[in-house]
C-alpha cells in the first residue's frame, strides 16, 4: 500500500512481537 503504512507497521510489529514474546 502506502510507504507510510509500511513505516507504521515496521514500528508496531516489533513492539507487538516484543510484548508477546516478552523479549525486548
Curated annotation (Swiss-Prot):
One term under GO cellular component: extracellular region
Locations listed in the record: Secreted
Tissues with expression: Expressed by the skin glands.
Keywords: Amphibian defense peptide, Antibiotic, Antimicrobial, Disulfide bond, Secreted
Gene Ontology BP, a term: defense response to bacterium
Keyword Flavoprotein part of the UniProt annotation: no
Cysteine-cysteine disulfides: 18-24
Family from the record: Belongs to the frog skin active peptide (FSAP) family. Brevinin subfamily.
Function: Has antibacterial activity against the Gram-positive bacterium S.aureus ATCC 25923 (MIC=3 uM) and the Gram-negative bacterium E.coli ATCC 25726 (MIC=24 uM).
Name of protein: Brevinin-1HSa
Native organism: Odorrana hosii
Lineage: Eukaryota, Metazoa, Chordata, Craniata, Vertebrata
